[in-house]
Each structure stands twice: as structure tokens, then as C-alpha cells.
Amino acid sequence: MGAYLSLSRIMPYRTLEAACARINPMTAPQDAAAPIRDKLASYIDPYLGQTLAQANAVESVSVHRNGALVELKFGFPCADYGAELLPVLRTFLEPELGGVHLDLTLRSDITSHAVQRTLKPLAHVKNIVAVASGKGGVGKSTTAANLALAWAAQGARVGLLDADIYGPSQPQMMGLAGIKPQTTDGKHITPLRAHGVEVMSIGFLIDAEQPMVWRGPMVTQALTQLLGDTSWGQLDYLVVDMPPGTGDIQLTLAQRVPVSGAIIVTTPQDIALLDARKGLKMFEKVEVRVLGVVENMSIHICSECGHAEHIFGSGGGARMAEQYGVKLLGELPLDIRIREEADGGSPTVAADPGSARALAYRQMARRAAARLATLNKDYSSVFPKITVEAT
């Protein structure tokens, strides 16, 4: 009889199992991913402020011949987040990886979030986000445009409604000035599209030189009709560029438009902060969650010498956010190129996506979307409507 060599007589079973894995490393032992998965669950994402376990973000962890593969799911647009997150996770998981290569794949799962209790979400629009300011001149419209562009660039389906009826600027900023939207059925308006975003504005429907002398009720009626009669299609986010101020028009719009969250734009100076606080309180009054505060024109850096100067003061947005228990979503620079790009019809995120100022907008947008992702979801479309009839 031929000789038969039994490896089990030479080495213990566990050692044998490991040896076989090395000999034929097509797959690793089934539990090899467990230490990585357990450690990964405890990672606190800086945008969510939650562990990946709390966010239910870990879809799968597997270990193969070529290394480890981690698949994550986020409730916010994350098309360009992997490049930022991968080196951080490699360092965080270094002991568990044991020197093997780490691959990371991300996907977005953007859901609808709750709106005011007295309102129903807009059909086919998952989330409406209002961008507001207590006063004009703080860069609200520029921030709204770049917010919409940043979400679209990160993979979301985005619309932009210019509700600043007395000074509609989005047609110019989005490069759509002079273009009129069309209708296919005589009832609904097809929005214009620019830079990957669906855009609608009262500015498309009136002459650019025509002053708006409407009273409050006419304004709110026109805007709610514009919102409802536009064929937005399927959107993850609809950004509403609100009129500046905290008067009757703004309050009525906040009561009639089903908003998932609001963003307050201010500059660091005390006068702007006084009005921004009024805007924040207005949204609280109508039960709209404030996602956070954006401090615009935070710092100016001289293009000639590089000198940094806080022209409008410093830290005002952070102090306001801390005072009211909301997030500081970002500190945006005062840069002449931001103004030039907006005036030219191509806001910063589209005009110069690799610049530091565009990065500031993208990070602000991700913080806002991540904050929204942590809030209560809307389940009205999941559960059937129950009607109780008296007998």
C-alpha cells in the first residue's frame, strides 16, 4: 500500500486550518471579518456625530485573499466621501487589519424625513430644505446655490426653488437668465436645468426690470403655487432660497411649505447675528428643525499677500450655534472669486470644484445632509391610512 500522510497527526487542528488557508487563500475563515466588523461599529463618523452602528451604516465586512472589503451605507450624499474616509479607517482599523489591504465602497440611501405636523410632504420630493437669513446681504442665495450644487455633485437628485420673490437671483447665478420654462400640459411647469440641478424661480416668469409690488398674501400664494405646480420629478432634496427677513411672508411660507429642515445663514457681525437669531426662533415656532448655522464671509485672505483678516468679526456663528444647541455647519470665506463665479452663472462648486472655497461648500453641504439624516424619518408613505367609521 502506498504511504498516506495525515497532516492532522503532525499539527493541531487550528494550526492545520490556518495552514490550509495559507495554502489555498481564496477565502479566509468565516469569522475572520468579525474583529474588523466589531471595531468598525464603534467608529464615530464626524459628520453624523454617531457611531456607524448607531447609524446602521455597516452593510458588510469581508476578508478575501487580497485584503478586507468594507461596504458602508449613509443617509446623505457620499459620492466623494470615500477618498476622505478611507485613510482614516485604515488607521482606525490598523490593529485588526494586520497589514492587509483595505477596500471601501460607499452608497447613499437618502430617505424622507418628517415635516411640520400639520403638513404633508410634497409628492416625489423626499426633503425640502429652507435656506434663510434674518436680513439681506449675508450671502444666503449664493450659499443656497452652492449647497444645491454640492449635493448634486455628491450624487443626489436636487432641485432649487428661488423663493426670494423681491430679488430673485438664482436665474443669474445658475446661468439661466433670460430663459423661460415650458409646460407640457398647460397646468404644470417644467423646471430648467443647470449644473445638474432642477431650477425654478419667479424670475423666469417676469421681466428682469419689473419690480415686485405684491403684498404679503399675493407673494405667499404665488410661491406656494410655484412650488406645487412645478414638475420637479423625483428629488432627494429641494433647496428653497427663502426671502430674507422674519416678517409675515417668511412666517407664512414656513407654515405652508412642508420643510424637513432649515439652514440659517449669517455673517459674524453682531447686527447680522441679531436678525439670524430671529430667523432661527421663527422656524422653532412653526416646528421646523434647524439643521444648523452657516457663517458666511467668515474670513478674508488677501489674494496679493496672503494676509488673513476677519473683516466682520470672528466666532459669531459658533457662539450662536452653541447658544441655541444647533450645529455650526461651516465657515465660508469672503473671496472675490465666489462673487465673480456667481455673477458669471457658474457658482463656485461648479466653476472651480477643486478649490479650497469649493471644498468649504462641499463640507458644509455634507454636514447639513448628515444632520438631516439623523432626524426622524417620515413613515407616512409606509403605513396605510386607517379610517375609523362609526357604526
Predicted regions and their residues:
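Conserved catalytic-core segment of NTP-binding enzymes
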Residues: P87, W232, D236-Y237, P243-G344
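Walker A/P-loop phosphate-binding motif and the immediately C-terminal alpha-helix
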Residues: I128-I165, D185, L280
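Extreme N-terminal, non-catalytic leader segments
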Residues: Q54-A57, H64, F74-G75, Y81-A130, ...
